[in-house]
Amino acid sequence: MPLDAICLRAVLHELRPQLIGARIDKVQQPARDQIVLLLRGNLRLLINAGPNQPRVQLTEVLRENPAEPPMLCMLLRKHLVGGRITEIEQSRLERIVTFTVRSVNELGESGTKKLVLEAMGRRSNLLLLDEDDRILDCMRRVEFEVSGARALLPGLYYQLPTPLDKLSLLTDPEGAVELARRGGGAEETVERFLLDRYLGVSPLIAREFAFRAGHETDVRFGALNDAQRETLAQEFSDTSNAVKEDNYTPVILYRDGKPVDF
């Protein structure tokens, strides 16, 4: 499955105890969309900002690096090597992660830099910010005429994407559960209803909710009785509590002995 915002939150919850305080010894860029941070303690943090599988994870895979490091890699080495990761934050319930790194420059002055991963499909990006959130550089530069008000260029101040007008399981759990209970129009599918109205809900999660409520992944709200709508609301309530409390149960789907989804 794609790394949706809820799954990303779970991954970060697992990574923080291992990464907070870790010293960055090396920075590598084995591919255009990939950065690998080699951390003290023999940890390798892969940050993939590609359009197909954007993600962040620990890895044991040794990737071949180009003979000449790309410009972004050299910039990251200049600002991050020798620094320590002090914070890892997820913006709202979005697929945006900020790694805060405290380091000492050539003059012996302490400062912070931020490495921001926007794991947003074809719009995925990786940005290096200074302590004032000014962009030092990014993996994909975006001009004004392409993105409208949100350009991503060196020298500009970084801005988060415009918030989506959706309910969050974290900031408004009661409203989210009540909306799930009321539901949408009779001909609207549960999957589409959930995708259009809730932050962090991926198509796979939406179909799972629909199946648990109506025993079909493409069930429409008009086909749900009161008990099934209450089941949907309860599923939302349980999920909201689990996410807020960081209570996760990772699952891997195997087919013929090979992992095919998670």
What are these regions (language model features)?
Residues 1-57:
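Extreme N-terminal "head/tail" segments of very large remodeling/mechanoenzyme assemblies
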Residues 15, 41-262:
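Phosphate/anion-contacting hairpin/loop surfaces
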